[in-house]
């Protein structure tokens, strides 16, 4: 597994900072946000690799960097960590053909499209880089990863806004179940912390603007003072493998994907339906496909974006768990890293697997005064040591798309 | 070496990320310097920009080596 996020570079580095209750949110540094309503975001820290920061040239050769938008850079960083961690470097043609890639993005190369638009607008269309299109295309993370490692199996990509990461991992696991591949590198990558991305979500009144002077307090899921989400950038990638295949080669197995459920709201382009009934149905479908009892689930990594929709998701989870709600821990790790859009679901699925590995529920930062009381423990401020055998992770996207994934220890 | 040759060499080194010593006049962008077809399109654009010349597509297709590029640009500049 591999992660690059506002908490830094690397799986264990991210996890230990998350569990320690640290935040990756700050004032936007990659450009001057003064003209915009929102000034905060989660950006990947730049610095030496040893310090858990990103030095891009350690991962992507300088001459290749300009051929890819930043979301591809970040996807390659996390994919490299994940593939190295998995130890799966197939040499034979047959093994390569049985290894595929499914890495998505919610938005893709937004900054690249912005820059190219200006070139054309200025009457310099003939000066447009021949790398513009392949730099911006969402499926090019999958493409670059396949080229780097020689993975010749299914090469696919998912685009379902903020549900992308969960859909990519879920769909990739289904491809393995259907026999299309033995190994799939799956996840999401996003780099939309740019003027156009921030301005667009500002116009949709989706971003937090009340905490510009206290960035670390801006992402506060379920808190009564929350006023919108905080955008983050990064990537989360996992290597999925058919169980017997992994066992036969003695691979390190972090966990098992046991359930996956999807639904559509058919309601509104950005707002969830009453009681988040679409989320309820996605979770229900995931539980059904896992063949488990709801009470087996000890931890839920919520979509919990720090918007009004948080309480609707809470209602849906309460409805699903019924009398078992009191035994459940549910947190939103977006409180620490912001909302990574198309990468969110992948990073959060990884956090869910690590929660099982270490029997720790990561905290929900800034949950000072819940706007709604609940029997569910939302792990305010500090991580909790508790037994977690099975975890569920939710991701919901604009367009009314919902996805839930259930993971279990092995 | 002429000023044009120097500048061409510098652009090639920068765009293809190759060592300066490999950028000899005879070096082919694709066969010797690791460029692909998109790299060569970008290189020609960089030459156009740097030398304020127009390199039409049919001429660009004939620029395969470092020397081809230098010769073409020198001829344009002399004209």
From Swiss-Prot, chain B:
Lineage of origin: Bacteria, Pseudomonadati, Pseudomonadota, Alphaproteobacteria, Acetobacterales
Claim: Hydrolase is one of the keywords in the record: no
Gene, per the UniProt record: acpP
Residues bearing the modification O-(pantetheine 4'-phosphoryl)serine: 37
Example of a GO biological process term: lipid A biosynthetic process
Cell location: Cytoplasm
Family from the record: Belongs to the acyl carrier protein (ACP) family.
Name of this protein: Acyl carrier protein
Function: Carrier of the growing fatty acid chain in fatty acid biosynthesis.
UniProt xrefs under SUPFAM superfamilies: ACP-like
Modification note: 4'-phosphopantetheine is transferred from CoA to a specific serine of apo-ACP by AcpS. This modification is essential for activity because fatty acids are bound in thioester linkage to the sulfhydryl of the prosthetic group.
Organism: Gluconacetobacter diazotrophicus (strain ATCC 49037 / DSM 5601 / CCUG 37298 / CIP 103539 / LMG 7603 / PAl5)
């Amino acid at each position: 597994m591999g992660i690059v996020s506002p908490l830094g570079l690397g799986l264990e580095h991210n996890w230990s900072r998350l569990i320690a209750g640290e935040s990756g949110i700050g004032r936007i540094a990659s450009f001057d946000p003064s003209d915009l309503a929102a000034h905060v975001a989660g950006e990947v820290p730049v610095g030496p690799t040893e310090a858990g920061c990103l030095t891009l040239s350690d991962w992507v050769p300088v001459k290749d960097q300009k051929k890819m938008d930043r979301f591809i850079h970040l996807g390659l960083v996390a994919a490299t960590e994940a593939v190295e961690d998995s130890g799966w470097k197939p040499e034979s043609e047959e093994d390569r053909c049985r290894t595929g890639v499914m890495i998505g993005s919610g938005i893709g190369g937004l900054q690249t499209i912005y820059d190219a638009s200006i070139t054309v607008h200025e009457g310099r269309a003939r000066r447009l880089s021949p790398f513009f299109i392949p730099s911006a295309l969402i499926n090019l993370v999958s493409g670059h990863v396949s080229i780097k490692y020689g993975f010749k199996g299914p090469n696919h990509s998912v685009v379902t806004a903020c549900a992308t990461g969960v859909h990519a991992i879920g769909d990739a696991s289904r491809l393995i179940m259907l026999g299309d591949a033995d190994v799939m590198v799956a996840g999401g990558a996003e780099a939309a912390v740019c003027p156009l991305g921030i301005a667009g979500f500002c116009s949709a009144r989706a971003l937090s603007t009340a905490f510009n002077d206290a960035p670390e307090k801006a992402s506060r899921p379920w808190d009564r003072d929350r006023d919108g989400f905080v955008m983050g950038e990064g990537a989360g990638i996992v290597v999925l493998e058919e169980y017997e295949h992994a066992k036969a080669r003695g691979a390190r197995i972090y966990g098992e994907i046991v359930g996956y459920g999807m639904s559509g709201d058919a309601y509104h382009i950005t707002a969830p339906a009453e009681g988040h009934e679409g989320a309820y149905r996605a979770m229900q479908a995931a539980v059904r496909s896992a063949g488990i009892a709801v009470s087996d689930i000890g931890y839920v990594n919520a979509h919990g974006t720090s918007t009004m929709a948080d309480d609707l998701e809470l209602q849906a989870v309460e409805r699903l768990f019924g009398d078992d709600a009191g035994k459940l821990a549910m947190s939103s790790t977006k409180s620490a890293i912001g909302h990574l859009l198309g990468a969110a679901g992948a990073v959060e699925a990884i956090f869910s697997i690590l929660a099982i590995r270490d029997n720790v529920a990561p905290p929900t930062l800034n949950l000072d005064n819940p706007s709604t009381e609940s029997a569910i423990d939302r792990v305010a401020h500090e991580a909790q040591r508790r037994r977690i055998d099975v975890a569920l992770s939710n991701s919901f996207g604009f367009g009314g798309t919902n996805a839930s994934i259930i993971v279990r220890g092995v | 070496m002429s000023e044009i040759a120097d500048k061409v060499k510098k652009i090639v080194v920068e765009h293809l990320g190759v060592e300066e010593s490999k950028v000899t006049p005879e070096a082919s962008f694709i066969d010797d310097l690791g460029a692909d077809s998109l790299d060569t399109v970008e290189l020609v654009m960089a030459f156009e920009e740097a030398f304020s010349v127009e390199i039409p597509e049919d001429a660009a297709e004939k620029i395969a080596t470092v020397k081809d590029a230098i010769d073409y640009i020198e001829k344009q500049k002399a004209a």
